[in-house]
Design a protein with these regions (language model features):
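Extracytoplasmic gating/loop element in the C-terminal half of outer-membrane beta-barrel translocons
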Residues: 161, 220-315, 319-321
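Membrane-embedded beta-strands that build the outer-membrane beta-barrel scaffold
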Residues: 12-20, 25-33, 68-76, 84-92, ...
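Outer-membrane beta-barrel and related beta-rich outer-membrane complex signature
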Residues: 37-43, 92-117, 222-251, 326-336
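Conserved small-residue
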Residues: 58, 75-192, 321
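Flexible, solvent-exposed coil segments and beta strand-coil junctions
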Residues: 4, 8, 43-55, 67, ...
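Outer-membrane beta-barrel signature, preferentially recognizing the C-terminal barrel domain
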Residues: 1-26, 55-79, 131-139, 193-198, ...
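C-terminal beta-signal and terminal closure region of outer-membrane beta-barrel proteins
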Residues: 57-65, 112-146, 250-258, 273, ...
């Protein structure tokens, strides 16, 4: 396709680097504004479904990324036996589509629709519009759970008609956003996105004589994930696969404080088949990424004269990875994602989480 070109990016930065206190303290600060245009993506509008071919790749749209990064490092040797260091970084990112690149028939800006559907149960959950971030979740909002049949029956439109005619106590209450008296795709709203607003990490280490200990923490803030696995794990009680133990906490007349809808065989209210923000969760986290303890045995090794002549070294260490995670996310791992497309991240269908691991090693140089 001779009309298809590479994506183009323009970026400007404003930075500041400082070294203070005889280089014990270093600071790096950077503000950036990046514009990426002629994005390469599949044509999602004006492509007839009857043509029998997949939609072609086209250049369309413009994305902006604006934010700042900050990093600080401090290291010091207190005496010949003791030294330490502390390091941390923090970044903030604001992302939005500044030009969608397509128009509707009436001349208004179009949208990019990402699939993100889950099996045959949940339809598409993504849509990106001009002024919205990439990876925007496009969902029907909920307003709690009906606590009685009377409350469900009283949820009516301006004409007195029930908005959710099949709802009873224990069902989700969906927001009739467009006010037409029914719950459908017209009630979808932009509900955030999977891209973290902030990312951060900090690490530190101490060395006392031959013993060294170091640790690194890493995390994100403002990220969201659509935990679609709840559709299987918390829905009807029949089937040939295990449910989550949290299903025991589903709403009932004796457990009215639960945020899990009631158990039912056919789900007449669509609690689990409606693409709603009930699936959407805060995926912010703080993780102990690495902890390492090491001991230098070189002095013992060099007691042999030929090892001393060669200045040989010996160190043993024990290292742990992904030792614990602090998060409000109810899934296995707030970092996992089923989807890999740029327009469909942040879907969690209980993909395998990052594993915890331990490594014992020996570093020997002769």
């Amino acid at each position: 396709n001779p009309n298809l070109t590479w994506e183009t990016s323009e970026q400007w930065d404003l930075g500041l680097d400082l070294d203070l206190f005889r280089n014990r303290l270093s600071l790096q600060m950077d503000y950036f504004d990046k514009r990426t245009f002629n994005l390469i993506q599949t044509q999602t509008m004006n492509w007839p479904s009857t043509i029998g071919l997949d939609a072609m790749l086209v250049n369309q749209g413009e994305v902006r990324n604006r934010g700042f990064e900050f990093q600080a490092n401090w290291s010091d040797r207190v005496n010949k036996n003791f030294s330490y260091y502390i390091s941390g970084n923090f970044s903030y990112l604001k992302n939005w589509v500044s030009d969608i690149g397509v128009k509707n028939a009436d001349g208004t800006p179009g949208v990019w629709v990402g699939d993100g559907s889950f099996r045959s149960t949940l339809p598409y959950v993504y849509q990106t519009a001009e002024g919205q971030p990439l990876n925007s979740f496009y969902l029907i909002k909920t307003n709690g759970i009906f606590q009685s049949d009377e409350e469900a029956a009283a949820y009516v439109d301006k004409n007195g008609n029930r908005i959710q005619p099949d709802a009873v106590a224990g069902d989700l209450k969906f927001v009739d956003y467009n006010g037409d008296g029914k719950i459908d795709d017209g009630d979808r709203q932009y509900c955030g996105n999977a891209t973290p607003k902030t990312t951060f990490s900090f690490s530190g280490g101490i060395t006392y004589k031959k013993l060294s200990v170091s640790a690194m923490f890493q995390g994100v803030g403002g990220a969201q994930s659509l935990y679609v696995a709840k559709c299987m794990l918390l829905s009807d009680v029949e089937g040939n696969f295990n449910r989550s133990k949290e299903i025991l906490n589903a709403w009932s007349e004796t457990n009215t404080s639960s945020n899990i809808p009631r158990l039912s065989k056919n789900d007449p209210n669509g609690n689990f088949t409606t693409p709603s923000d009930w699936y959407l969760e805060d995926a912010s986290y703080l993780r102990l990424k690495n902890l390492t303890v090491s001991y230098d045995l070189s002095d013992y090794l060099r007691k042999w004269s030929h090892m001393k002549e060669r200045n040989s070294n010996l160190m043993v260490y024990l290292s742990g990875e992904n030792l614990f995670t602090i998060t409000n996310y109810s899934g296995y791992d707030p970092e996992v994602s089923k989807e890999s497309s740029i327009l469909t991240p942040g879907i969690d269908d209980s993909s395998y989480p990052r594993s915890k691991g331990f490594v014992f090693g020996i570093n020997l140089s002769l």
